[in-house]
């Protein structure tokens, strides 16, 4: 099965990179988070993620160093590849760290449900009995 450009005829050149990063993450544990894929691909730096989690950035996209069309492609490829591996999409929960009330964190400037879900979903390897 070819993934990437939607028409089944060409493979997105970013797909092999996503496949490699997903394999690396799965070698360390059963969960793939798109945010971790973006960090490992150096699309966003760890210190920016920590600033966002602490409330220092109003939304995660503010710290992203790459173009948003590339980020969108990477999120889509991550989702497609993880589902092709049989990983189960599970809602991720991201809340502000630190003292005080734990507010949900925003990923995108717009805050629309589709964008938020693309960033926050986790893909989990099914448990085999």
Features from the language model and the residues they span:
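Long, low-complexity, charged/polar intrinsically disordered regions in eukaryotic proteins
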Residues: 1-5
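Positively charged, polyanion-binding regions of nucleic-acid-associated proteins
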Residues: 11-35, 44-45, 50-63
